């Protein structure tokens, strides 16, 4: 008697070529937790002690466009809610990976799919700006390394932007695949094992004949009648 899984494995258990997908998922969730925790602390300090954080012109990206804001406190409620939500679903994924609970990985996986779709739409829509990318950068006064980028050749700058978008999309797809493989690994691990008995052949004398063979078989002689003594 042997045991085998009731479902074959069609996923990889390696992440980044150096660790298990479960470990990689825990590291990814922990990273998101730390980033959003720091963001929540920064927003809390900005709201409770507005004089501590200096007033600066902050630019943040929302669906490919930059919007200027004089103070982060104006959008602190929305940003804090987003940070709290991201921290929660990241903590759920870490707990699910540690405790082997597949259901706890689904919220973060759905967020990854939504983020990937939005990123693809942003990348596709940004292709319309590529021929006029220098004009677009010239309208952003505080864009980092603006002068260095404007000094580059247009074709070279276009190539850099395309490579950046491609690597960005590939990275997001790889992280989605990592979480999905972890989901499949935990699901397969929680499946019950099925006992499989080896097949054996019955001896010929115990095998019933087919209908054709039974018809061709000669009839047996009837048993002698019973004669009382």
From Swiss-Prot:
Query: What keywords appear on the UniProt entry?
Result: Membrane, Transmembrane, Transmembrane helix, Transport
Q: Does the keyword Membrane apply?
A: yes
Annotated TM spans: 25-45, 78-98, 104-124, 156-176
Q: Where in the cell is it found?
A: Endomembrane system
Pfam families assigned: Mtp (PF03821)
InterPro entries, alphabetized:
LAPTM4/5, LAPTM_4A/5, LAPTM_transporter
The keyword Membrane is annotated on this UniProt entry: yes
The Gene Ontology CC terms held by the record are: endomembrane system; lysosomal membrane
Q: Which membrane topology term applies here?
A: Multi-pass membrane protein
Q: What does this protein do?
A: May function in the transport of nucleosides and/or nucleoside derivatives between the cytosol and the lumen of an intracellular membrane-bound compartment.
Quoted from the entry, the domain comment is: The C-terminal domain is necessary for retention within intracellular membranes.
* Family according to the record: Belongs to the LAPTM4/LAPTM5 transporter family.
Q: What is this protein called?
A: Lysosomal-associated transmembrane protein 4A
Q: What is the lineage of its organism?
A: Eukaryota, Metazoa, Chordata, Craniata, Vertebrata
């Amino acid at each position: 008697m042997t045991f085998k899984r009731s479902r074959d494995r069609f996923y990889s258990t390696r992440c980044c070529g150096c660790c298990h997908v479960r470990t990689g998922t825990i590291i990814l969730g922990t990273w998101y937790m730390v980033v959003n925790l720091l963001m929540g602390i920064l927003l809390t300090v900005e709201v409770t002690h507005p004089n501590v954080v200096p007033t600066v012109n902050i630019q943040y990206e929302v669906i490919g466009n930059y919007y200027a804001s004089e103070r982060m406190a104006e959008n602190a409620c929305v940003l804090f809610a987003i940070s709290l939500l991201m921290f929660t679903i990241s903590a759920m994924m870490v707990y699910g990976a540690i405790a082997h609970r597949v259901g706890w990985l689904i919220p973060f996986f759905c967020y990854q799919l939504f983020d990937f779709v939005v990123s693809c739409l942003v990348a596709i829509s940004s292709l319309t700006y590529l021929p006029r990318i220098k004009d677009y950068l010239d309208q952003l006064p505080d864009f980092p390394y603006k002068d260095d980028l404007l000094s580059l050749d247009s074709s070279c700058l276009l190539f850099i932007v395309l490579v950046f978008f491609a690597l960005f999309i590939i990275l997001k797809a790889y992280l989605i695949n990592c979480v999905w493989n972890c989901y499949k690994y935990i699901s397969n691990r929680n499946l019950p094992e099925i006992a499989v008995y080896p097949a054996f052949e019955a001896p010929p004398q115990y095998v019933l004949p087919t209908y054709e063979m039974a018809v061709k078989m000669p009839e047996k002689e009837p048993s002698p009648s019973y004669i009382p003594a």
